[in-house]
Amino acid sequence: MNNNIFSTTTTINDDYMLFPYNDHYSSQPLLPFSPSSSINDILIHSTSNTSNNHLDHHHQFQQPSPFSHFEFAPDCALLTSFHPENNGHDDNQTIPNDNHHPSLHFPLNNTIVEQPTEPSETINLIEDSQRISTSQDPKMKKAKKPSRTDRHSKIKTAKGTRDRRMRLSLDVAKELFGLQDMLGFDKASKTVEWLLTQAKPEIIKIATTLSHHGCFSSGDESHIRPVLGSMDTSSDLCELASMWTVDDRGSNTNTTETRGNKVDGRSMRGKRKRPEPRTPILKKLSKEERAKARERAKGRTMEKMMMKMKGRSQLVKVVEEDAHDHGEIIKNNNRSQVNRSSFEMTHCEDKIEELCKNDRFAVCNEFIMNKKDHISNESYDLVNYKPNSSFPVINHHRSQGAANSIEQHQFTDLHYSFGAKPRDLMHNYQNMY
């Protein structure tokens, strides 16, 4: 711990100071310090306290005096000095100083032994330090809670912003709510609105008089003041009058909207002007014109839908016609092919029949020659034998008819064996020869 010499200018009250104490021993009262008192009194008092503590509590360490390391000057001069060369001296050696009175010198290098402290003592010290810091720093004090603001909406009037709510007297409140019950309204604002509409002619009269006379004369002002109440300047009255006169000049269709603005106290001047669009402003159309425009638009849409439907139907017809024509062409081609094949078959058959008729025995020569070998000798003898002219001729015709029937039967078998195709038949016929 650094051994420094401090000077202080604080004054201590005449009362005894009680320092924090623990449970083992009570605190000892200390004499108050004053610049006029001598240092000897302080040292005597401190030594007496330490001796008593050593006698009573030999197991505890000595508690150092709070003024053992401070040097007090009577002239209240601020001076701090430190001499490192005096660290090796004894405890009772004093440090010479030429700037102060020699009687105020006292030991500096007293060895200080740390005394163990208990938790209760540390808690008390912390609480005292917090109290001192809060008392010295006003910023550390808790800030006051802000007052509760009025969250009700306000309205702008000629005399400034006002609250929308109003406090009625007992008589006026009874009359107002009685009128509200008779009219069947659910809100008091509707009742007040009804009263304003009933009193509108009189209000307009007052407003016109205010607008014609920009500044009131003494007579006019005295006549109108009791009706409107006290206002500070004539400009407020002029503004109030202009609000009613402008509303009266407007159309009767918008009376409800303007009346609502008057009740709320919202003037036209307070509204923000919207920037004009670059495109030209279209004229307001009436209901009939808008209905006609809607009908024309519907007609145009119906025409477009019909055109689309017609186009689709035409496409379908064209596709169907193309498909029908294509099918007919395919059918005609098939028919022509069938006719050609049938014609060729008939033509070939005719040719074959003609050839067979002309060269019937030549076509089936081998077959006939083979069949002749199987004919009985009797029939052959009958054909060749001619004892009588009539009998052999008959037999010859019979044998010839039998041969013809056999040839025809075999020809039909040959025809069916070759198949139905005439080309194959002609090919086989050519190969035979």
UniProtKB/Swiss-Prot annotation:
Q: Which GO-annotated molecular functions does the record name?
A: DNA-binding transcription factor activity; transcription cis-regulatory region binding
Taking the first listed entry, what is the main subcellular location of this protein, grouped into a coarse class? nucleus
Can the keyword Ligase be found in this entry's annotation?
Answer: no
Q: Please give the residue ranges the record annotates as the region Disordered.
A: 130-163, 247-281
Q: What UniProt keywords are attached to this protein's entry?
A: Developmental protein, DNA-binding, Nucleus, Transcription, Transcription regulation
**Entry keyword annotation includes Metal-binding:** no
- Recorded protein name is Transcription factor TCP18
Q: Which organism is it from?
A: Arabidopsis thaliana (Mouse-ear cress)
Gene that specifies this protein: TCP18
